[in-house]
Amino acid sequence: MRFQFKRRLSPRKRRHLRVRAKVFGTPERPRLNVFRSNKHIYAQIIDDTRGHTLVAASTLEKEVRERFPDPHPKIEEARIVGQVVGERALAKGITRVVFDRGGYKYHGRVKALADGARAAGLQF
């Protein structure tokens, strides 16, 4: 009776676990991870062999917020975050990444972030 109620993962978490089983970042080609909340979007470039975050950007940063046009829809915010993470990655010598959509559909803000990173010069 102790384990009568099985804890269930959300569908996004299950998809993310499936994706993470296949996507792995190396030093030559690290992983570009996306996390999307209702209000903000976050992007990290991660080297999974060492477990270190090499580059990060989010809509919470003042430097990123200053680039937002007025008014700024969330898709435009995501595109700018993608550009910033791409610029920071190129400054550190990272040109190729593996895109980890984090269990989200490749649509809307996630797609806009990926397009912004590609526009900045990242290849994936």
UniProtKB/Swiss-Prot annotation:
One of its GO terms (molecular function) is structural constituent of ribosome. Keywords: Ribonucleoprotein, Ribosomal protein, RNA-binding, rRNA-binding. One of its GO terms (cellular component) is cytosolic large ribosomal subunit. GO terms for biological process: translation. Transmembrane segments: none annotated. The keyword Nucleotide-binding does not apply. Part of the 50S ribosomal subunit; part of the 5S rRNA/L5/L18/L25 subcomplex. Contacts the 5S and 23S rRNAs. NCBIfam families: L18_bact. Belongs to the universal ribosomal protein uL18 family. This is Large ribosomal subunit protein uL18. It comes from Thermomicrobium roseum (strain ATCC 27502 / DSM 5159 / P-2). The lineage of its organism: Bacteria, Pseudomonadati, Thermomicrobiota, Thermomicrobia, Thermomicrobiales.
